Amino acid sequence: MKQGLSPDWITRLFEHPDLLRMGHHQRAEDQNLGMGWLYYAFGRMIRPRLAVVIGSWRGFVPLMIAKALQDNLESGEVVFIDPSLADDFWKDAARVNDYFLSLGVANIRHFRLTTQEFVKTSDYRALGKIGLVFIDSLHTEQQAQFDYEAFSGMLEPRGFVMLHDSMIVRPDKVYGGEKAYGMSVKYFVDRLKQDPMLQLLDLPFGHTGLTLLRKLDEEATRNPYDWLDDGPR
């Protein structure tokens, strides 16, 4: 598989119509990955050993981040957590593996669990440091907080958290109209914005937005060149 986001790879990706859905600002007509460009870029820029993605309709985000990590010299891995509650798409482990491999991505490890279940496993305890966390599970304030608190303590010093569906409060019908619930991730993000040791940026793209989060250095007075790669230029 060639490195980078080639036109051929994007064409193969968008042969799956569901990979154009769920608010990532994609568009097939001009092979536009929307926020997928950002997900890939962060994977390439941070170069993490490990990224965690919580929730995905058909795998757009884990695919974009895993493609980036696979293209890096460091050959990182994506841990993808999704219990397949919306439908049966993620239930068959062999089918899931074949699906990702069909798109040339071989570094996604899927766990068909909720975050609440995953944190009780030996796999969770063995994770170590994480460079990138993407939160897109049940879109409630409470679940977003649980997901964040489960992984934020493992974040690398220059790691990032991305929270999807973070700017709009509205009904969420992903489980069907009869099981609609209130999307409220924004309320958790609003609380995070009150923490002076966090830096957050809202990106108003897609249907419901994305928020980037990084932890500020606890030694805020030190020279920034101490942590920038290679010092001043």
Functional labels for PLM-detected ranges:
Residues 14-45:
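Class I SAM-dependent methyltransferase Rossmann-like catalytic core
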Residues 1-19:
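N-terminal, positively charged/glycine-rich alpha-helical extensions of SAM-dependent methyltransferases
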